[in-house]
UniProtKB/Swiss-Prot annotation:
Name of the gene this protein is made from: Phf7
InterPro entries: EPHD, PHD-type_Zinc_Finger, PHF7/G2E3_ePHD, PHF7/G2E3_PHD, Znf_FYVE_PHD, Znf_PHD, Znf_RING, Znf_RING/FYVE/PHD
Catalytic activity: S-ubiquitinyl-[E2 ubiquitin-conjugating enzyme]-L-cysteine + [acceptor protein]-L-lysine = [E2 ubiquitin-conjugating enzyme]-L-cysteine + N(6)-ubiquitinyl-[acceptor protein]-L-lysine
Record lineage: Eukaryota, Metazoa, Chordata, Craniata, Vertebrata
Required for association with and ubiquitination of H3: annotated span: 244-301
Binding-site positions, Zn(2+) 5: C179, C180, C204, C207
SUPFAM superfamilies tied to this protein: FYVE/PHD zinc finger (SSF57903)
GO molecular function terms attached to this record: zinc ion binding
Subcellular location: Nucleus
Full protein name: E3 ubiquitin-protein ligase PHF7
Length: 307
């Protein structure tokens, strides 16, 4: 047995033995996030990949980092996060070890007071951690995350209301509707729905609830973007709706220039269905009177007759 004097001769050796092995992430040739050290990835999971000068970071890593203040206005820095503060947070995170991958650079800590778990955002998502995108933007490890009382027996037997595929047997991958208790969704399906519809159109797919449903989804870690719906941001997404129907749908078209041609007045004027507007006919092709401006297609005629 070594004496006390002999032990004191090798303090470094003793410290090396007691210290857990920590590995550094390999450097990537592609730009990586300063706060999680990973590449851009899926924006629905990690948010927009922001780049300014030589600074690259996921938007979600910015807003979820445990000690990163937002000091600037939204138009300054990266959404109000100043470059010097981001770099300072990266230095702090470089001393924290992710409990999932055992590598340094973990900027997010579980918000439970008794928990000391730190993790990279992508690692935490893979291990069932949950982050909330409202208020204080808190994050939790799997043990301390908010939960729902989902009946375990139904998992794997029932299907997701949105994609109609079987639910996962892992409960953290499913979310139950607060207003339609029988409706259970895949987390990834709800997140995709929220990412597309955004704040102003996000509602319960079953009953259109716009209050209780979004609040519960936020509590359960769904990110609901505060912007217009995706389909409203796409240029010309509804351009076809502004185009007038230009085709004769009569069983036999009599116009010598064809179904897609017509005149502004007279026998070959194109009359659109007065109910749906998505079918048309030349006056002569449906034996309409010379001054007739109203006509209904075969699909709408039975409905109008019944009413």
């Amino acid at each position: 047995m070594k004496t006390l004097k002999e032990k004191n001769k090798h303090p470094r050796l003793r410290k090396t033995i007691r210290t857990k092995k920590v590995t550094q992430r390999k450097l990537s040739s592609s730009p990586v996030c300063l706060l999680c050290l990973q590449e851009p990835g899926d924006p629905e999971k990690l948010g927009e990949f922001l780049q300014k000068d030589n600074l690259c970071v996921h938007y979600f890593c910015l807003i979820l980092s445990s000690r990163l203040p937002q000091k600037g206005q939204p138009n300054r820095g990266l959404h109000g996060f100043m470059p010097e503060d981001i770099k300072r947070e990266a230095v702090r995170a470089s001393k924290k070890i992710c409990f999932v991958c055992k590598k340094k650079g973990a900027a997010i800590r579980c918000q439970n007071d008794q928990c000391v778990q730190n993790f990279h955002l992508p690692c935490g998502q893979e291990r069932g951690c949950l982050s909330q995108f409202f208020g204080e933007y808190k994050s939790y490890c799997r043990k301390h995350r908010p939960t729902q009382n989902i009946h375990q027996g139904s998992l794997g037997e029932e299907s997701c209301v949105l994609c109609c595929e079987n639910l996962s047997r892992t409960s953290v991958e499913n979310i139950q509707s607060p207003c339609c208790s029988q409706a259970i969704y895949h987390r990834k399906c709800i997140q995709k729905y929220a990412h597309t519809s955004a704040k102003h159109f996000f509602k319960c797919p079953q009953c259109n609830n716009r209050e209780e449903f979004p609040q519960e989804m936020l509590r359960m870690g769904i990110h609901i973007p505060d912007r217009d719906a995706a389909w409203e941001l796409e240029p010309g997404a509804f351009s076809e709706l502004y185009q007038r129907y230009r085709h004769c749908d009569a069983p036999i078209c009599l116009y010598e220039q064809g179904r897609d041609s017509f005149e502004d007045e007279g026998r070959w004027r194109l009359i659109l269905c007065a109910t749906c507007g998505s079918h048309g006919t030349h006056r002569d092709c449906s034996s309409l009177r010379p001054n007739s401006k109203k006509w209904e297609c075969n699909e709408c005629l039975p409905a109008s007759t019944t009413s």
